[in-house]
Structure formats: C-alpha cells, structure tokens
Amino acid sequence: MLYIVGIGPGPGYATERAIRAIEEADCVFYEDYTGPIDVETLRRAAKTPPIRLTRRDLEDESGRKVLECLREGKRAVLATAGDPMLATAHAALIAAARARGHPVEVVPGVSIICAAFSAACLSIYKLGGVATVTYPRGGVYSTRPYELAEANLARGLHTLLLLDVREDGSFMPPRDAAEVLMALEERERRGVFTPQRPAVVVHRLGWGGGVVVGPLGAVAKWDGEGPAVLIIPAQLGPVEKECLEAVAQRI
C-alpha cells in the first residue's frame, strides 16, 4: 500500500489522517524540493527514521526506492509539503505503483494555494490561475506569468505566482521574482508588471513568515526570503481590501 501524504506548509498543519498514515507505514519517505517539509513531525510519527528523496530519486529514477519497499509487501508513505498532488512527480509515482498492482491512497494536505489566499484574505472565487516565475534559462524568459496575469487582470481575477527552485534546492526569493517580472515588462511593454504594479507576498507560511504588500518595485528591494508566493491582485473588493490591510505589512 502506498500513501501519498501532504502535511501542509509548515509545523502544525498535518491532519490526523496524515499522521495516522505515517504511523502505520513501514517505510516513510519525504521530499523537500517542492517545498520545505516539517521533518520533525515525520520523525515523531514514523516507526523508522524517515528517508529523504531527491528530485533525481523521484523523477530520474521513477521512485525506485519507494517501489522497492512496496515490492517487499510493506506499507510506504511519500510525504510532501503542502498538498501532494500539486507536483507532477507524485502523479507519476502513483501511476507506477498502480501499474505494479499496489493500491494507492492520496491523503490531501493544506496547499500553499489555499493557505496563501486565506492568509491574505483574498477571495478564492477570484483566483484566475497559477503560473511559476522561473529564472531565465539560457537568457530566455518564460512569458507564461506575463500572459496569465494580463488575461486575469482584464477579467478582474487574481493571479497566483509560484516561485522557482534553484539547482541547489534553494527557493527563489521574492525580490528575484519581482526583478524577473519587471524584466518581462521591459520586453513586453504592455503595462502588466510595471514597478508600480501592486503585489502581495506570502512568505514562509507556517515557518514564522507572513504577508507583505507593496508595489513590485518595492518587493524587488525587500530582503525577505523564500519559500514564498506572489499574488498579483485585480481590483480588490471592499472586504478584501479591509482585511488585507489588517493582516499585511506594507513595504
């Protein structure tokens, strides 16, 4: 039996079902390249020391270590930060396990998408879509965040932007994301990511972080660290505006 378990964005977010799955497992694996994970919770609940899997373990080797545990007739857990099904690597592991005749249960967790909108007091009904801000590869910038935000703003919808993970496993800080977005504006020049564009940063949620709000130009100078997400809000409703101002630090 394979359990794909999300334990939320930080300490204290794991559900009772997630803890029970970890307690019942013979092998507990976790990955921390899609988000920082509360390893201490895993250690307290697991029968044996949790085993860290790298991106290479899951993607290049197709989760071989997890599949070996299953082949021995054991219960295996792959624990992730947030909600487990936001990463395609986890879907590939599910398919591989089922193809070998192993039953699979997905244990949902609190996703960064829901948590970020809740923390910032924004209406989930106005979420227009999600894109990832990436560092340029070979000098080439992905225009997906620009195109999505442009379409969403025209429709009165908020845009949630996930941030890149570096090759060394560290997370893109919000200031780098703001620089990338403004560099896209220099190329596209359609007024989407100007230095004056309002932005909401939800950073280190569950790890002592919080919510900050300010124009992209100010975010580019802010020294907060990742992991974080950026939200490019459309026009805020009265309740959204009042609540965001109450919970956010202005920069």
UniProtKB/Swiss-Prot annotation:
Keyword Protease part of the UniProt annotation: no
UniProt binding sites for S-adenosyl-L-methionine: D83, L86, S111, I112, L163, L205
Pathway linked to the protein: Protein modification; peptidyl-diphthamide biosynthesis
Pfam families: TP_methylase
Single biological process term from Gene Ontology: protein histidyl modification to diphthamide
Keyword Transport: no
Enzyme Commission identifier(s): 2.1.1.98
UniProt xrefs under InterPro entries: 4pyrrol_Mease (IPR000878), 4pyrrol_Methylase_sf (IPR035996), 4pyrrole_Mease_sub1 (IPR014777), 4pyrrole_Mease_sub2 (IPR014776), Dphthn_synthase (IPR004551)
Reactions that this protein is recorded to catalyse: 2-[(3S)-amino-3-carboxypropyl]-L-histidyl-[translation elongation factor 2] + 3 S-adenosyl-L-methionine = diphthine-[translation elongation factor 2] + 3 S-adenosyl-L-homocysteine + 3 H(+)
Gene3D superfamilies in UniProt: Cobalt-precorrin-4 Transmethylase, Domain 1, Methyltransferase, Cobalt-precorrin-4 Transmethylase, Domain 2
A GO molecular-function annotation: diphthine synthase activity
Keywords for the protein's UniProt record, in alphabetical order: Methyltransferase, S-adenosyl-L-methionine, Transferase
Entry-linked HAMAP family: Diphthine_synth (MF_01084)
PANTHER family: DIPHTHINE METHYL ESTER SYNTHASE, DIPHTHINE SYNTHASE
UniProt subunit comment: Homodimer.
Record-stated family: Belongs to the diphthine synthase family.
Its job: S-adenosyl-L-methionine-dependent methyltransferase that catalyzes the trimethylation of the amino group of the modified target histidine residue in translation elongation factor 2 (EF-2), to form an intermediate called diphthine. The three successive methylation reactions represent the second step of diphthamide biosynthesis.
Name this protein carries in UniProt: Diphthine synthase
Species this chain originates from: Pyrobaculum calidifontis (strain DSM 21063 / JCM 11548 / VA1)
Phylogenetic classification of the source organism: Archaea, Thermoproteota, Thermoprotei, Thermoproteales, Thermoproteaceae
